[in-house]
From Swiss-Prot:
It is linked to Intellectual developmental disorder with abnormal behavior, microcephaly, and short stature: An autosomal recessive disorder characterized by intellectual disability, developmental delay with poor or absent speech, short stature, progressive microcephaly, hyperactivity and aggressive behavior. Some patients manifest sensorineural hearing loss. This is Pseudouridylate synthase 7 homolog. It is found in: Nucleus. Residues 1-97 are annotated as: Disordered. The lineage of its organism: Eukaryota, Metazoa, Chordata, Craniata, Vertebrata. The modification N-acetylmethionine is found at residue 1. Interacts with SIRT1. Belongs to the pseudouridine synthase TruD family.
Amino acid sequence: MEMTEMTGVSLKRGALVVEDNDSGVPVEETKKQKLSECSLTKGQDGLQNDFLSISEDVPRPPDTVSTGKGGKNSEAQLEDEEEEEEDGLSEECEEEESESFADMMKHGLTEADVGITKFVSSHQGFSGILKERYSDFVVHEIGKDGRISHLNDLSIPVDEEDPSEDIFTVLTAEEKQRLEELQLFKNKETSVAIEVIEDTKEKRTIIHQAIKSLFPGLETKTEDREGKKYIVAYHAAGKKALANPRKHSWPKSRGSYCHFVLYKENKDTMDAINVLSKYLRVKPNIFSYMGTKDKRAITVQEIAVLKITAQRLAHLNKCLMNFKLGNFSYQKNPLKLGELQGNHFTVVLRNITGTDDQVQQAMNSLKEIGFINYYGMQRFGTTAVPTYQVGRAILQNSWTEVMDLILKPRSGAEKGYLVKCREEWAKTKDPTAALRKLPVKRCVEGQLLRGLSKYGMKNIVSAFGIIPRNNRLMYIHSYQSYVWNNMVSKRIEDYGLKPVPGDLVLKGATATYIEEDDVNNYSIHDVVMPLPGFDVIYPKHKIQEAYREMLTADNLDIDNMRHKIRDYSLSGAYRKIIIRPQNVSWEVVAYDDPKIPLFNTDVDNLEGKTPPVFASEGKYRALKMDFSLPPSTYATMAIREVLKMDTSIKNQTQLNTTWLR
């Protein structure tokens, strides 16, 4: 087993920013068609609610084994502006981002900047195009039962309580408007009466079901008025119904959570949840999931939602682009972060240059030895200010530096509205003025500026606290990951790929030292390294001193990782240094058209599409890889080991100046 240094072989990458649109229909026309088709659903579902804040460009923390006031008018104005926001970036902003992305990446990070410097295999590296199309990267979640999630059933579970499809068309737009105003207590009416034109029991039943399903919290009754039949809607529980409308209309015999498989293309999990929330008119926090999935990929994962019927969810399949919902079931419990067993990846590397022998050696090494379990580049952000630098400033209690790192102008091109916001901040130090430059205020910069407007420049800690907790913790987790990557590289450089006395292994969740007399009982796959914290132990060899020196250089005390603000105290965790993927398989295929898909997705299979057939020879060659990884493990680091090169976008941009043309 040999360990090799980084080589300078080029990794080409496709146009990451440009979305594929193979339908032949202009994107805008398709969007209008979909929105028109779905306007009925958007206007009739439940409550109008604020959405939870979502932060852009902050990497999410992987799971590890753990050890242990400004003016009122200004704040009101800011909140009013937020209410006017829609799905995020305007089309103008999206175009601006696309045009400037390559320039922005030139000022980003390389792998060496974050401690990623070693390989475990000795094969010769080769190049390939990663994610030329987002459909070349498919992620299937592995559930807590060990099964790989697939979308293969769009049917709705049989339930006598479920209303028919007619509930979506039986009410007029005016009736829906009146019912929504009643539901939300927007006027003084205590009831709404709807005349039954076709007085049949079936028609009355559908109207009853439509009101109860589409306007949770309302009850109905039938009344005779002057010889005519009316369905009368009213609040059975007063304003309590508004607080939890689903509580008053959900059958007791049915599990409270509808579980479903979400298939999505080119959208991350939180963005997808926000879209579903908007169409259903509910808060995002009624959804639960076991893990977040990245944007530029096709991903399949299980989601649970509180007291939303499978029928309402299935109706969204008619409305949403790049989403598909299916495999519905009712369960008693939600899903919890970290419950998944891992993810299964199907990855296509196009236009590979490696010979069949090189590919064989690379994939055999991945299968038999594995790869260094580095935290991937997405852990550290994509701009000129890495997230670990912000995390380090938080741990140092340097709050002015935290504010400056997030808000100051930075080198390299950036989204146009952010450039204007940063320039305004640098010029005026006025958070309200800078915030006005942001059309999207739910990014980290917008949230911090809101906090500064509310709490003032002398209370940066409280202002920073406006950012959602998980996103704040991303910064310090990024710093921990930065330290871990550097220390693992040094551990492998000093001791190679065999366990040595003083290394750490886990027994359950507890770390213990490898002693001289039992070193032969372990392999490198058992060895773990700590993320720095107050509740971990460090290797009992010279890597312990390397940890101490690195933290001391950053003005941090390795013996005192508790912070005066409890949220930012680091307990630490342990992480395996080498990961061996499971279910590894691969094939090299020949193809001529770089735009054709090289395998079927779940949706392709549902639609009955024939799997692609490959000729024995073609203009290009591609490597199709399948493998499963445990949670918090980065597939890009496995791909890096196969190709033997720097996977950072900065390096790819510098070595491939035409990759975005």
